[in-house]
Amino acid sequence: IDELTQSQWRGKLGIAPTNSSFQAFISALIQSRGEAGAENWLTAIKANEPKIYEKNSQIVEAVDAGELDLGLVNHYYIWEVSSELGRPVKAKIDFFQPGDLGNLINVSGAGVMETSKNKVGAEKLISYLLSEATQKRFVSDTHEYSLVLPELKPEDLPALSEVKAPAVDLSTLADLQETQALLVKVGMI
């Protein structure tokens, strides 16, 4: 991700700082480099005059229109925007070097609240979501990866094991207060 702070990317990068996936990425950056290191990276990115968007899909649309060279988005937005437009977009998916924070893998989870009034129904829903048939549909329809069936992968993408995600404790990424405060401090939100 450090290469994005180089002057060659001035005004050519799109980000969505209010988006939860970008904030999870910044939380991982804080975890990896500490708050001062994350602030330094954000300050360098801001100095490079990135284009700010509300949503990842807007970044993909801007790359497709030739308004940006690249954007930091979740990979599945390429398919989402292509589907909405009814054609392939010019934006392409690329990955950072192995272990780079730019390869962060966000996850979605499900659980049953202790206070649930319908624990049996909630557990059935989770079992359904984790079933092989649902996971296959999840991969084919949303173009996201399955952590339950890692051998499944979205079409035209490398296997998850080949992406070489950074070592990040994902359980720490849910608390976004520190991240949001840092984004406010550097003037991104």
Regions found by a protein language model. Give the residues of each.
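Sec-exported extracytoplasmic/periplasmic mature domains
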Residues: 6-10, 30-34, 47-50, 64, ...
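Short, hydrophobic alpha-helical packing/hinge segments within bilobed ligand-binding/sensory domains
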Residues: 59-60, 68, 78, 122, ...
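Extracellular/periplasmic bilobal clamshell ligand-binding domains
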Residues: 153-189
